[in-house]
Amino acid sequence: MRQSQAFIPTLREVPADAEVKSHQLLLRAGFIRQSASGVYTFLPLGQRVLQKVEAIIREEMNRIGAMELFMPALQPAELWQQSGRWYSYGPELMRLKDRHERDFALGPTHEEMITAIVRDEVKTYKRLPLVLYQIQTKFRDEKRPRFGLLRGREFMMKDAYSFHTSKESLDETYNNMYEAYANIFRRCGLNFRAVIADSGAIGGKDTHEFMVLSDIGEDTIAYSDASDYAANIEMAPVVATYEKSDEPPAELKKVATPGQKTIAEVASHLQISPERCIKSLLFNVDGRYVLVLVRGDHEANEVKVKNVLDATVVELATPEETERVMNAPIGSLGPIGVSEDVTVIADHAVAAITNGVCGANEEGYHYIGVNPGRDFAVSQYADLRFVKEGDPSPDGKGTIRFARGIEVGHVFKLGTKYSEAMNAVYLDENGQTQTMIMGCYGIGVSRLVAAIAEQFADEHGLVWPASVAPFHIHLLTANAKSDEQRALAEEWYEKLGQAGFEVLYDDRPERAGVKFADSDLIGIPLRVTVGKRAGEGVVEVKVRKTGETFDVPVSELVDTARRLLQS
């Protein structure tokens, strides 16, 4: 492609609303443009990268026997009503009505649609297992789109679905898909970890997320410093043990704590450590109220609360709800004397507290000398807190450390969640009706482009891995007015293309400095500069990743380029 004829609108300044490196550079280098909040146009360079990523995904999906199809983004509400998610999915589901007042959704995912298709077409065990996938536009009405392609309202996704007659068959496909995902991310050059995860609104039990390591990641990964263990922080179990003090129980007393609302403030006021405090948080759990207790230096984990209570929706109560239910403000809550309508559950660490401190359900007052069991009842003790750095690793090897990650892939064992709800059944070998067992597997394709850009960039611009780069070689002349340089560049533009390389030829009448700056910004793996030694048949090759430069005779250019791109 000749750059003089290409649409590559680069920017010299960083856009004011671009917060993270990938967003800034993809805008500046002319790969994307924002069309609305959370909605982006892929310009020609961005589209080429997107197509490279999609090609890798297709190769790995086809290798494990998955078959590609294409489903509509516009989905009838009836399908979502059959699964129950029309009511439970929340405001992220984009809903609309047609001119006949019929309800539709713009799909954030396609479990309902694919289940209905397979339900209507597959009637016998002889057609199973079946693995289908698509690469499709998805929609999610994010409350706060941010970080460019990393959290948008319209995005590209690869979603695959598998249907089985047995859990063993599902396990085999799940493992195949897991390995295919690892291959995809390795081929994209990424530094990633597969972590144990929560299934969220999709449902199901066993699930893993694939996280690209990045300081701007919205997810925290808890990993062992001595093994391969890794989990999303929401799912990492706490295996720490707590020893109860042999200190004799003290008298329960109510004391004034005027203006002290946080654990840190109360602990400082009473001259105790936060570990002696009991933090009380009121949650609305599927319409009922639950008071969750954790130690003062710990944080309550809503995902664990949801899983322990087998709940669908868990939300922290609003200040208004808290006042109405507890007759006290948030900063003064405690488990002593609560209404029978409020269930009290506690983290295991709370059981070991002796002579602790908790809110008195009265503004400006706390109890001291608090002892669980004696002073208040707990309906259930469970692991309800987030793991902390330094906690023992759940696999018994080493201790927990934290890293940040960008989720780019997720694999689920759905079981019969959707097939039961939507009556996706088949006849087995004995003619008996059985429910299909399902798995689903997603990759955020446009998010993956941003994650690659986030990991592969420097102070000058993007540094694309060869596998996904928009072009292999950026060819340019140092002196646009030199007939000798232009003639050699034209000759090798043709020859490199004939040798199978994808070449962007900067034939613009610009100064060398402008061309070099744009080349570094765009980030093509190799830059070939036809300069002062053109008359000798020698060009300069620069490796974008390392900055290394080589003077190469044009007779060796093809072999040199192949070697450098493969290294």
UniProtKB/Swiss-Prot annotation:
Entry's localization field: Cytoplasm
A cellular component annotation (GO) from this entry: cytosol
GO terms under biological process: prolyl-tRNA aminoacylation
Family matches, as InterPro entries: aa-tRNA-synt_IIb (IPR002314), aa-tRNA-synth_II (IPR006195), aa-tRNA-synth_II/BPL/LPL (IPR045864), Anticodon-bd (IPR004154), Anticodon-bd_dom_sf (IPR036621), Pro-tRNA-ligase_IIa (IPR002316), Pro-tRNA-synth_IIa_bac-type (IPR004500), Pro-tRNA-Synthase_IIa_type1 (IPR023717)
GO function terms (MF aspect): aminoacyl-tRNA deacylase activity; ATP binding; catalytic activity, acting on a protein; proline-tRNA ligase activity; transferase activity
Superkingdom: Bacteria
EC number: 6.1.1.15
Keywords from the UniProt entry: Aminoacyl-tRNA synthetase, ATP-binding, Cytoplasm, Ligase, Nucleotide-binding, Protein biosynthesis
Catalytic reaction equation(s): tRNA(Pro) + L-proline + ATP = L-prolyl-tRNA(Pro) + AMP + diphosphate
One of the Pfam families matching this protein, by short name: HGTP_anticodon
PANTHER family: MITOCHONDRIAL RIBOSOME PROTEIN L39/PROLYL-TRNA LIGASE FAMILY MEMBER, PROLINE--TRNA LIGASE
Domain notes: Consists of three domains: the N-terminal catalytic domain, the editing domain and the C-terminal anticodon-binding domain.
Assembly description: Homodimer.
Similarity annotation: Belongs to the class-II aminoacyl-tRNA synthetase family. ProS type 1 subfamily.
Function of the molecule: Catalyzes the attachment of proline to tRNA(Pro) in a two-step reaction: proline is first activated by ATP to form Pro-AMP and then transferred to the acceptor end of tRNA(Pro). As ProRS can inadvertently accommodate and process non-cognate amino acids such as alanine and cysteine, to avoid such errors it has two additional distinct editing activities against alanine. One activity is designated as 'pretransfer' editing and involves the tRNA(Pro)-independent hydrolysis of activated Ala-AMP.
UniProt-recorded name of the protein: Proline--tRNA ligase
Species of origin: Geobacillus kaustophilus (strain HTA426)
Lineage of producing organism: Bacteria, Bacillati, Bacillota, Bacilli, Bacillales
